[in-house]
């Protein structure tokens, strides 16, 4: 079973990964 806490944890990881990807992308383009 998947609990709400596991879903929240997964969303936090996905959000962090997205922010890091955008940050790295901007550094590469500059």
Swiss-Prot record:
It is found in: Plastid, Chloroplast thylakoid membrane. The keyword Calcium does not apply. GO terms for biological process: photosynthesis. It is a single-pass membrane protein. One of its GO terms (cellular component) is photosystem I. Its main location: plastid. The chain crosses the membrane at residues 5-25. Pfam families: PsaM (PF07465). InterPro entries: PSI_PsaM, PSI_PsaM_sf. HAMAP family: PSI_PsaM. Belongs to the PsaM family. This is Photosystem I reaction center subunit XII. It comes from Emiliania huxleyi (Coccolithophore). The lineage of its organism: Eukaryota, Haptista, Haptophyta, Prymnesiophyceae, Isochrysidales. The gene is psaM.
């Amino acid at each position: 079973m998947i609990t709400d806490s596991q879903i929240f944890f997964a969303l936090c990881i996905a959000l962090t990964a997205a922010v890091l990807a955008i940050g790295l992308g901007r550094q590469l383009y500059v």
